[in-house]
Amino acid sequence: MNKNQKPVLTGQRFKTRKRDEKEKFEPTVFRDTIVQGLNEAGSDLEAIAKFLDSAGSRLDYRRYADTLFDILVAGSMLAPGGTRIDDNDKTKMTRHCVFFAEEDHDAIRNYAQVFNKLIRRYKYLEKAFEDEIKKLLLFLKAFSETEQTKLAMLSGILLANGTLPATILTSLFTDNIVKEGIAASFAVKLFKAWMAEKDANSVTSALRKANLDKRLLELFPANRQNVDHFAKYFTEAGLKELSDFLRVQQSLGTRKELQKELQERLSQECPIKEMVLYVKEEMKRNELPEPAVIGLLWTCVMNAVEWNKKEELVAEQALKHLKQYAPLLAVFSTQGQSELILLQKVQEYCYDNIHFMKAFQKIVVLFYKADVLSEEAILKWYKEAHVAKGKSVFLDQMKKFVEWLQNAEEEFRI
């Protein structure tokens, strides 16, 4: 059965909505238009920004965003891998781009403003620009050292002002640029530019937010992925703040693993001697200081028990439990700082767990008798090193014992 032929409208014109009136260009035609506009604007970045602003109303930035950003950064379209498609035809290139700018922070910052204005004007370019920078970082091997430096500075400045997210840095963990040493060198330049705009806290906060704080070692080949090498490399480059940051982050990761293992051993009621040996080995292997370990031990010991909900019974239960593990704590409280940290941890714990409020003084006295805490540490805590939590309550509890320590004349009775 034949289908009826559908009627055809003749002589009818459909008007395109103004917002859809975009010139239909192939990438090469789009390129030629952008290159011509940049060349006409010359080195006047304000004129370049105005050209890009007005051109967006007639050129299809959404479709050709990668071409647009290739030209603004490298001066021409880039082939996969980063080579310039138009390298032999100077009419298809422009020198008014990031790679031909002066290798100077202020000069690159001025170019960064061009990108900021463009992306503020055409918000849909934000994701495309992020993808472009990720791509360019993968192409680093194809760029000269000075081009790499300028791209690093641009990226650092745009990271600092929030135009780019820190997640772009994942491209630096690619094997081919890591093995060549390009990733680490680029990262140093990028972080320096970032910190010139903001500060170290801005960098470390963004890295944590992007879950990159524990991946920084991946900037180096596998045989050099250790804290010492990272610290030496970044410190010599003038970025000691990042070296210190990585040490802290690695230490935190190590402490979590140590705490997990200790919790397991405590639940299995392992002999204290075995736990002492294990902790000492971990301290040596991971360069953990004693003050960091004592607080962790206190947490593990207190987490190992299901505490009685009745205030009048919990103190007795706590003293019995802590008396058992006092020898373990004593091994790792040989320094004044360690003792003060332990005292502060006990204070915070008793404040945060209301049933322990009245047990604080008894715990401190127990630790004093078991050689976990010294007279000097207790007196220092009492005079100046206590924390704010429950201060008045705990200082009042400790008053008589402190007087006894100070006078050492009359016997203290619990």
UniProtKB/Swiss-Prot annotation:
Principal place of residence: cytoplasm
Positions of region (Disordered): 1-22
GO BP terms in the entry: regulation of translational initiation
GO cellular component, one term: cytoplasm
Gene3D superfamilies: 1.25.40.180
Protein's cellular compartments: Cytoplasm
InterPro entries, A to Z: ARM-type_fold, eIF5-mimic_regulator, W2_BZW1/2, W2_domain
Described function: Translation initiation regulator which may repress non-AUG initiated translation and repeat-associated non-AUG (RAN) initiated translation by acting as a competitive inhibitor of eukaryotic translation initiation factor 5 (EIF5) function.
Family that this chain belongs to: Belongs to the BZW family.
PANTHER family per record: BASIC LEUCINE ZIPPER AND W2 DOMAIN-CONTAINING PROTEIN, EIF5-MIMIC PROTEIN 1
Name assigned to this protein: eIF5-mimic protein 1
UniProt lineage: Eukaryota, Metazoa, Chordata, Craniata, Vertebrata
Encoding gene, per UniProt annotation: BZW2
